[in-house]
Amino acid sequence: MAQVQYQGTGRRKNSVARVRLVPGTGKITMNGKPAEEYIPFANIREDMVQPFGVTETKGQYDVFVNVNGGGFSGQAGATRHGIARALLEVDPDFRGVLKSTGLLTRDARMKERKKPGLKKARKASQFSKR
């Protein structure tokens, strides 16, 4: 018998997360490691599981995430986006709740590129009038 699973892809900054939801106890595995080990910051982990709280499905699904690119924050954001999309597969009625909380929206903010002649994207050397 094939195991029921739901998939979703999330993106944030330079990170891409491929998320699989499997009915279970609520443990999260990221790139083969537990989420507590993979992302050391509790506040970022809490943001990551926000879709479960909004849809009241906390502890009902095990989450398997394959994520690459970016840092902790981007990867957690991509995972959150992927979980929200996977929950849509679980029940299309979740769309209204997820959309109103902004969890289905791809956060388009990216790092601004460095410009030639400047030290960073906007940081210039000190201006001297004379």
UniProtKB/Swiss-Prot annotation:
GO cellular component labels: cytosolic small ribosomal subunit
Keyword Ribonucleoprotein: yes
Region (Disordered): 107-130
An annotated Gene Ontology molecular function: structural constituent of ribosome
One GO biological process term: translation
Compositionally biased tracts (Basic residues): 111-130
Family matches, as InterPro entries: Ribosomal_Su5_D2-typ_SF, Ribosomal_uS9, Ribosomal_uS9_bac/plastid, Ribosomal_uS9_CS, Ribsml_uS5_D2-typ_fold_subgr
Domain of life: Bacteria
SUPFAM superfamilies the record matches: Ribosomal protein S5 domain 2-like
Gene3D superfamilies the record matches: 3.30.230.10
Keyword field: Ribonucleoprotein, Ribosomal protein
Family as reported in the entry's similarity comment: Belongs to the universal ribosomal protein uS9 family.
Protein name: Small ribosomal subunit protein uS9
Organism annotation: Ligilactobacillus salivarius (strain UCC118) (Lactobacillus salivarius)
Gene: rpsI
